[in-house]
């Protein structure tokens, strides 16, 4: 009986969806069970004065025949750990490049923003876009993975440690003291005694809202705990340090390094800043280079989570990045472009992008079939960055209606 059940679930992952056809204004829509595919009906021309493609009707109008009275508000699907939004993006083969965007209200027109404003032409039916609901992960705290110390030493002095909430699943330790530095260390650190609670695989750092958390990472030696801090020892060695942490084995998402080490912490963030921390890189005007983001994240067993890295959406930044995938327990290779005509130095501490963590399952055929064959499957969608989503496991459109929430 179990074998039959597993077989049925597998068949659901690559069977064909039921579809509904619709044409509105400039766009032709094919509505599947879990997503919408849209193409341009007419020839489209953009100029340097255009920031968007021709306006797309709101979701409520697109879905009115398939789901009468459709209404969606992302705020109604928001909780402390998850958030449902609609994602819209263009196919990688589109001749006009556009930005990846989120949709939060079904009543608003959809304005697809251009990647760059310039004179471009697209024949009819040459542009393809996908719209579908996706569940985003929100961090309920700043969790760091405890790793072995790569530069072990002898602890001759320890900071002050005060424990509280010892009768709870998540006791709190407060560490107070000064910073230390060793010759082979890149950052100053605090040393604490390695007690039994610190045998856990992760710690929750109790960061304060709207303040920069200076804890960079946590590692363990034979009899000590080492907490690296984002300070300059020569300048800050006399500063007192006060940190609160909780050891825990129950984490949905934890990091090797603190991604908020250069930006203020905000409670339950829906995105994580990608801050370049490598050596300075000189990028010529209007040129690009690949840099490595050396942080890693770890996901609880059984969860299908991946991250996509999206460029910071402001006009005053000097750099922009291509959308890319950031897989769990891996570093990320990021294409960074200099937006100006003049050489610019990508310096450590530069906030270049944001990471969004998606609760999405990779299509099991993505490691077997070629991209050409995968595109023929109606249950297979390629995200910007190369992640093939199993569309059969996405939330059904009919289940995202506000009436279903109530």
Swiss-Prot record:
Pfam families: Herpes_ORF11 (PF04797)
Top-level taxonomic group: Viruses
InterPro entries membership: Herpes_Orf11
The protein, known as: Uncharacterized gene 11 protein
Organism expressing this protein natively: Alcelaphine herpesvirus 1 (strain C500)
């Amino acid at each position: 009986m179990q074998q039959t059940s597993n077989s049925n679930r597998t068949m659901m992952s690559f069977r064909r969806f039921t579809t509904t056809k619709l044409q509105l204004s400039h766009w032709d829509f094919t509505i599947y069970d879990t997503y919408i595919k849209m193409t341009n009906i007419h020839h489209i021309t953009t100029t340097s004065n255009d920031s968007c493609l021709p306006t797309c009707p709101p979701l409520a109008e697109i879905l009115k025949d398939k789901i009468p009275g459709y209404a969606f508000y992302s705020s109604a699907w928001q909780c402390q750990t998850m958030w449902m939004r609609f994602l819209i993006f263009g196919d990688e083969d589109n001749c006009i490049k556009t930005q990846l965007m989120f949709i939060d209200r079904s009543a608003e027109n959809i304005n697809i923003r251009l990647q760059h404003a310039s004179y471009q032409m697209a024949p009819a039916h040459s542009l393809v876009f996908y719209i579908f609901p996706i569940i985003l992960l929100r961090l309920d705290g700043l969790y760091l993975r405890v790793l072995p110390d790569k530069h072990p030493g002898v602890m001759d002095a320890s900071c002050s440690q005060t424990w509280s909430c010892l009768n709870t699943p998540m006791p709190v330790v407060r560490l107070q003291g000064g910073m230390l530095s060793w010759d082979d260390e890149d950052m100053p650190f605090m040393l604490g005694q390695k007690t039994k609670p610190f045998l856990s695989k992760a710690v929750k750092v109790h960061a304060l809202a709207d303040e920069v958390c200076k804890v960079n990472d946590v590692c363990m030696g034979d009899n000590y705990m080492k907490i690296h801090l984002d300070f300059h020892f020569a300048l800050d060695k006399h500063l007192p340090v006060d940190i609160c942490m909780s050891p825990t084995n129950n984490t949905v998402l934890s990091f090797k390094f603190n991604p908020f080490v250069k930006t203020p912490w905000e409670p339950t963030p829906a995105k994580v800043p990608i801050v370049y921390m490598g050596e300075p890189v000189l990028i010529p005007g209007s040129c690009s280079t690949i840099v490595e983001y050396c942080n890693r994240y770890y996901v609880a067993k059984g969860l299908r989570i991946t991250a996509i890295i999206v460029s910071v959406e402001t006009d005053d930044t000097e750099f922009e990045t291509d959308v890319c995938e950031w897989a769990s327990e891996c570093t990320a290779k990021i294409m960074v472009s200099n937006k100006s005509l003049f050489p610019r130095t990508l310096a450590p501490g530069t906030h270049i992008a944001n990471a969004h963590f998606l609760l999405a399952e990779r299509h099991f055929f993505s490691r077997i079939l070629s991209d050409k064959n995968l595109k023929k499957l109606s249950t297979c969608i390629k995200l910007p960055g190369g992640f093939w989503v199993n569309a059969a496991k996405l939330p059904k459109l009919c289940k995202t209606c506000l009436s279903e929430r109530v």
